[in-house]
Curated annotation (Swiss-Prot):
<keyword id="KW-0547">Nucleotide-binding</keyword>
<dbReference type="InterPro" id="IPR006195">
    <property type="entry name" value="aa-tRNA-synth_II"/>
</dbReference>
<keyword id="KW-0030">Aminoacyl-tRNA synthetase</keyword>
<comment type="function">
    <text>Catalyzes the ATP-dependent ligation of glycine to the 3'-end of its cognate tRNA, via the formation of an aminoacyl-adenylate intermediate (Gly-AMP). Also produces diadenosine tetraphosphate (Ap4A), a universal pleiotropic signaling molecule needed for cell regulation pathways, by direct condensation of 2 ATPs. Thereby, may play a special role in Ap4A homeostasis.</text>
</comment>
<dbReference type="GO" id="GO:0009507">
    <property type="term" value="C:chloroplast"/>
</dbReference>
<keyword id="KW-0809">Transit peptide</keyword>
<dbReference type="InterPro" id="IPR045864">
    <property type="entry name" value="aa-tRNA-synth_II/BPL/LPL"/>
</dbReference>
<keyword id="KW-0496">Mitochondrion</keyword>
<dbReference type="GO" id="GO:0005794">
    <property type="term" value="C:Golgi apparatus"/>
</dbReference>
<keyword id="KW-0436">Ligase</keyword>
<dbReference type="InterPro" id="IPR027031">
    <property type="entry name" value="Gly-tRNA_synthase/POLG2"/>
</dbReference>
<feature type="binding site">
    <location>
        <position position="347"/>
    </location>
    <ligand>
        <name>glycine</name>
    </ligand>
</feature>
<protein>
    <recommendedName>
        <fullName>Glycine--tRNA ligase, mitochondrial 1</fullName>
        <ecNumber>6.1.1.14</ecNumber>
        <ecNumber>2.7.7.-</ecNumber>
    </recommendedName>
</protein>
<feature type="binding site">
    <location>
        <begin position="339"/>
        <end position="340"/>
    </location>
    <ligand>
        <name>ATP</name>
    </ligand>
</feature>
<dbReference type="GO" id="GO:0006426">
    <property type="term" value="P:glycyl-tRNA aminoacylation"/>
</dbReference>
<dbReference type="InterPro" id="IPR004154">
    <property type="entry name" value="Anticodon-bd"/>
</dbReference>
<keyword id="KW-0808">Transferase</keyword>
Amino acid sequence: MRIFSTFVFHRRQQIFNLRQFQTTTILRNPISIAPIQIPMDATEQSLRQSLSEKSSSVEAQGNAVRALKASRAAKPEIDAAIEQLNKLKLEKSTVEKELQSIISSSGNGSLNREAFRKAVVNTLERRLFYIPSFKIYSGVAGLFDYGPPGCAIKSNVLSFWRQHFILEENMLEVDCPCVTPEVVLKASGHVDKFTDLMVKDEKTGTCYRADHLLKDYCTEKLEKDLTISAEKAAELKDVLAVMEDFSPEQLGAKIREYGITAPDTKNPLSDPYPFNLMFQTSIGPSGLIPGYMRPETAQGIFVNFKDLYYYNGKKLPFAAAQIGQAFRNEISPRQGLLRVREFTLAEIEHFVDPENKSHPKFSDVAKLEFLMFPREEQMSGQSAKKLCLGEAVAKGTVNNETLGYFIGRVYLFLTRLGIDKERLRFRQHLANEMAHYAADCWDAEIESSYGWIECVGIADRSAYDLRAHSDKSGTPLVAEEKFAEPKEVEKLVITPVKKELGLAFKGNQKNVVESLEAMNEEEAMEMKATLESKGEVEFYVCTLKKSVNIKKNMVSISKEKKKEHQRVFTPSVIEPSFGIGRIIYCLYEHCFSTRPSKAGDEQLNLFRFPPLVAPIKCTVFPLVQNQQFEEVAKVISKELASVGISHKIDITGTSIGKRYARTDELGVPFAITVDSDTSVTIRERDSKDQVRVTLKEAASVVSSVSEGKMTWQDVWATFPHHSSAAADE
């Protein structure tokens, strides 16, 4: 996706923003970064201004008190001055508290978030949801192992993803190798542009990601330094908004301006320079075939387009999907499961006619309302707001129906998993974030203790990827539309005069020729008009990263009329890309909760996972250690297994209340307690309510609720209630 990358994988859009330098554009200047003015909250701005004034007043009054004491002024005069100083200090303290409250409530405060995150992570590691890889050898940053409950949740998430997308939409699933030849990633742009900017400690050589150091500095200043002026705070927020687009020179200038040093040693830092994030390898024993561990799964789908198109009966639209591992050699991994060096992606490439991006099932999602964050709201400093998806498409906020359809389907997928819909938003990419070939891009962002985390990218990438691989491989990756009757069409013909271009540009001739031939019709006709009126034109060649002067004798541009029996075109691609690890971590945070024990002397942790994704659907507890009850538990276990319900029997002598608490902490939604040889109770985790059912009914009831055929409310209304006040004690 571009995604991602902030988490495990860097935002793919950022990758492809860089990719745009390889493609041509006409009569455009090289990309320049205009500051995006993000208006500061009016209350925060007012409080910062007030605090600055109060600080000045306190300082001035303090000087006045010292001057009175130095001049041996009368005691009443000194006392009055001290009283005024104390009054000013109290006013300053009040403003500081108000400002700190505003910062915390706006999501910038870190103390509560850090405490919550620590509680979640401690529970996850203690219950073996995940653990650092190779822990007995001190581990390696950015590598984690999923333990038994973590594996179960991941399996359930991917199973539902297949059902929700691949089966529902009749997608074609593929499984491509992780090891990818260099030529493939050269064509896609990854070899040249899949980079982050890195700095080194000039004395120890320790590496850091440059933008992270700048982000940490700005964030800490905004959160903890209440003395900075409103103007300085606005400047820092502007830097946070645009720093992903900083060039190495701009980023280095900011690091020097703010005096940022190595976090561990306070040593000076080197200038930022690009570091390619792919793991390089060689294929075969000769070492002559260079390759990389794939940074995304999408390229495997693109290079197989021709075969998939034929497999689908040469019909559009169709979608191909892939679930698999991807790799990113992070400079300084942090944020736990959110930024790792190996991760699971689930990606969809939906191929569609660029002249018809309607979707037959759009009406199924058109009435959905959820938080959306269009670029206009971002630019004006507003917040995300609830919009009707159908209206957003109709007004052009979302570019087309197919893109809108997948946004709606992603929303349904995430909320069914257990993501809180009030902490889920769809943010549209700003103009400076998008590659020039992209029609529209949205990210599904989930709020966590780390802030808003990009977990799914949904992008209309036009025809860029298929064209790039067509050009590099020489294999046309195109689709056809046959006409019932021949049509007379006008075709754009661009003919570079290679002799003249060779004389003018010598070794750069090939770059200029490719750029001229890659122009779209609008760009070509604009060039033609300028050449006819002025005889020359400035033409920006992305692969050279500079403009060149094109004269009238260097290129011929015309339109010819032809009769055609079919239309051959390169399909556009709508691409939803899912960072599975990020989604799962955000799910952990959204489902984590605490509640007091019966005695009220401690807080008990629990995960409120929906049955759909819970690692274990049900536990079976004999109420007491009793051979008869244990035999009944084994019978129920067999019945649960026969209907495909994951479960666990606990026949330890521990009290039933402690066993409930233990499984609540794993997020198990249901517990069957055996206290008879004819009937049992079923306990629901969140409410702690219990019903009594017969032995024969137990497995079918748990199965029906786990699979969504019934709700717990249905069960509660159907079966006798059971009360056991002591059970949870």
